[in-house]
């Protein structure tokens, strides 16, 4: 590149520096930097010249050029010659000082240039800067800034000049009056001092190692004098901060005696500024530097300033941190650093100041002080070593503070103490207890808002930090092990530490394991030496009980069990082996569940089994008694945890059951009865469970103790008449009685069965009844307390169940049975019949269920009362509650219903005869006929249950008639059509059971399965659907089954019952009765022959009435008989029915399809009527020039509707199959010629008004009607798969519309080929006569249909290929372009359907396709597009010699389409180009290779095409082009980057491609660049942006020898135009390309 070209390139970029888009401007700067990387001197000179010549250029753009120069200089300054460096230094100096005003961006950029040059030419830069320092005159602020920056960037180069600089600056310090100038001086002095300190700290690398601090001390002190005594007094806060920042590093350079002399003024001066400045970080940082300097010189003055320093610093640390800004947080760190300096120099004075402040009640003061204490404990450990006792004693008051912030700070201090040995001192245990207390804080008391800087609210909570601290201290601080063990054990049992159990257990487990590793002696606890520790019994009970709620407290169950397992040597020496086996099983069970999935009862039973096994292994009565005593003592601890207290009662019962001492057992039982909190329901239940478990081993003692308690003074006081009204409330007495009644119930339920029967009536029930009713003044008073009632019912239920489950139940005579049943029924009747609030009626019915099974049997009236009372109590309840109404309510409802079912089956079991069954059904009959659906559903469900039970337990000893079969079937069968689905299902089950009962009474075995009866089960699915047609069809089938299995003698009773059902208030059931009556008449009407005419007549007359649907089958039958004699007349008369057809007419049409022969005759007549008339008539209603409207003719339309109705009947199937080809072709042509056809005006008006309820709801629109009929024909002919495929693909909807009709015909052909292939030969034969149809729509439809058939192999398999090709070839010259296009598509489909036949027909196919490329005058003809798509499919399959002759012509013909405005043409042409390349792999002629090379650039650029399909086609084409270019690297790059579905990083890919292109095809540079120039003018922004990017990469990878191929001036000019493109992205890429052109040097 000549110098003029380089200059032109730089000039072009510099002219673009004024672009308004910041990204473009940044890219221009980057391009300039690229030029500078290659040609730094020329680029820098061009920039210098540009700035010099454009003196009026605005300062933002001057700054941009200067920044570009700085970036070049930062890496290429070493390549500058002295003259260039001098020129740049002068330019930057001039730019920097051109204006005296502060223009920071511009002056900063110029300063940056000087600093960059100064790294290499420090002397020249310093010379220029010193030249700008005029004696007695204030320097420019930018000069000061540059000197400061140089001091940091090149300290070794600047520091030797410092004396000269300072000598020039110091005299004018006093002259500086403006605050901005003074700030600049302060910044410079700060940087000078920092540079000097760096120089002095690294003298071994310094150019002059003889430099000492004294060289600067005098000048620095002079500057200090001005800064401190004059400028620090300024009112400008920014200046004061700048002064303070400078004083910090300057203090290290002051002479020692001067620093000592100035400290009394300096320190108060700095401290005073704390009150004036909000941002105190710089003050604290500088103060820390001054303190370090003072300490380093051993200042004595510091001692006198200490009080003021501590007070000021303490006030800073106590300031609330309201912001999480870095400066605020950094200030805290700097203040603490100051405290560290003071702690190391004056520890006593520091503690004397800090510790008294811990006693203050002010939150900020206490938190800040604690923060400092923690810091000095960690940072000045050596100085604090002998101060530990004082620090510990000072924590007394902070430990009592309830403020959460103070608590957090205290916990952090204790953590620091633990690491440094404080907690081993006297008083350390108080700290540990404090941590445990904080671990026990309840979660609900945690602060909701996080502290400053906290991302997770929980992470900073007092409890969370305490838990972490306790665990870390226990596990990581070895010296704490002997302090915490076994001390932490004493926190396990107190209630106030319950919340800390989980962290306590985890820490204790870790400590215990460490002790075990140290040896048995170290692990075993000496309880004599640790009197405050809980006993082994207390620990065992506590840990076992809290494990019953294992997921509370962050999983305390698992933690407690692990601790219990680890402590086994300290619990009892025999437990080791057993606990090591069982505890892991319990832990594994917890791991398998969550809090939501854990079955609580099962878990508690596992724990109780663990306890029982443990007691059995110990087998020491004294130990067991001691454990029971401890468990009883712990009862008050769980008053606020009812579930755990309930479990504790169970543990007590289990432990007492294992005890052998009767005295201990009775004593503890007495104490439990006396101390129980009877007002709590959970406690009453727990107490009862305890007595029940204890009774397993001590029945006599348990009952005796209950008797003793009743006779005791405590109990008698509670029930005395005076106490009822005075001392105690009646409610309290009822609670005590409830508990006692429950105790007796649980004793009966748990005690051994062989012992309990003898006690039931004499002891247990006597006491239960005695406690339930009380006599006052000789009068029996019944309780009103529902809780007491429920306890009575529960206990009686448990007693009854115990009797029933006993092996001696059969011989047991229960004398109080009738009394108890009456009592239960009284409770049931007392419950509200419309709501279910308590489980009383459920429990009472369950009790009755058990009582019914016990001797003696109930009399008939009592049985009836029980059944009637329970049904009335349950059946009228509102429907089953939904889940959202409450899971408990739904559960109670279901359980109550199950209790009723169990009771009824128990009663039926006592009378297993047809009469007994009928009695039960008679009780249910009113509910079966109830007008309320939920009552019918329940009644049918219960009936089905009873019938199933009766059938399962049927025992027939002799053949007897089931005399009430017809009556019962007549009651249930109409319910198969009930509005409630559940009722319908249950009705079928009832009929099913009744039929099998009849078979049983006929002598068939119980395992016999009747085929007819079994069909009922398969019909149940049909009853799920609410569709009446399906429902009544199922009812008809049920009627057929009944008719086949009903004995002749039962027919009359059944019919009579059915006729009664016609008046059923539930209309659906009435209709079902009609359906079943008709079925019975058809199947069994022989015995009622004289009644048939009358019945048919009645049903036909009902058809004319509004509610005559139930007689419709009879009317249909009549029409059928008429049609068998006069088919043509019936068809003609029905076709005259007005459109749209009403529902009665539709049903009559369907009746004609009952018999296949008649159906075929009817279909033939309808086809004839449809084909006879024209499908539509054209009408010009308004404007003469308007396209005429097409209006459907009535006769074909009526015939179409009739065809649909006839074929919608299943019986029409054989007739439809017989006429399949004719029906399919006629209906397909009907569809094609009705697209866009309108209804006659009168029918349109009816459609707008809406059909009446009696009219069919089917769409009458001509095309939709034809499509529906075609679909119905396919369904009826067995082509369901075709219909399903069309449904899934939306084919039917496409057929209905003008825009989608062609695609709909295509999809129909595809579905036919796939699922109805054998039908096609006859269909095509019928279609043959339609090729020359006068209707264009019909030609398009048939061509689309035929074209798609070639897409399937069915054409070849059925030997239809030749005929299809001939049919399509004949249409190549059709006047309709759509037909010609579809012909090409069909020919191309041969590639998919019969690929092996393509070679045979190759010339014919290629000729047609190539001819299609030139179809018509329109270059963008859809026929041409179809030809390209077809060629892409065929080229791989034809013979290569057939393709060669047209290959070049095709490539040339499709090339213009690459840049077509139409996306479809771009996609098709590019993809075809890829296929042509694929075919030519390894055998590419030169003329075609030239086309490949010519297409390379367009393909690469269109990868950025706005249309994704075009970009995808380019990916494919490039992958195919790769092998033809004979460059493995390029081909590999195409394969790697351009795979489908892989994200393309276009820049990276283009860079790689250009590298390979230029390496292997260097001669293509000019040609490729010329193509790029063409795309500079592309209408697509992305492509226009890709072109200069492509250009830049080509140039980047080119070699200098390729320069002759490039017209650089033309390229620069074109890119210069792009720099003015409206799209920022294009301008950015153009600038980037210009930066790359430097490569052509």
Swiss-Prot record:
It is found in: Lysosome membrane. One of its GO terms (cellular component) is cytoplasm. Keywords: Lysosome, Membrane, Repeat. HEAT repeats lie at residues 3-41, 159-198, 344-382, 385-423, 1048-1086, 1358-1396, 1605-1641. Disulfide bonds: none annotated. Pfam families: HEAT_Maestro, HEAT_Maestro_2, HEAT_MROH2B_1st, HEAT_MROH2B_C. InterPro entries: ARM-like, ARM-type_fold, HEAT_Maestro, HEAT_MROH2B-like, HEAT_type_2, Maestro-like_HEAT, Maestro_heat-like_prot, MROH2B-like_N_HEAT. The keyword Membrane applies. GO terms for biological process: lysosome fission. Coiled coil: none annotated. One of its GO terms (molecular function) is membrane destabilizing activity. It comes from the Eukaryota. Homooligomer; homooligomerizes at lysosome scission sites. Belongs to the MROH1 family. Lysosome fission factor. Recruited to lysosomes by RAB7 (RAB7A or RAB7B) at scission sites and homooligomerizes to mediate the constriction and scission of lysosomal tubules. May sever membranes by inserting amphipathic helices into one bilayer leaflet. Lysosome fission is required to maintain their steady-state number, shape, size, composition and function, and to accomplish regeneration. This is Maestro heat-like repeat-containing protein family member 1. It comes from Homo sapiens. The gene is MROH1.
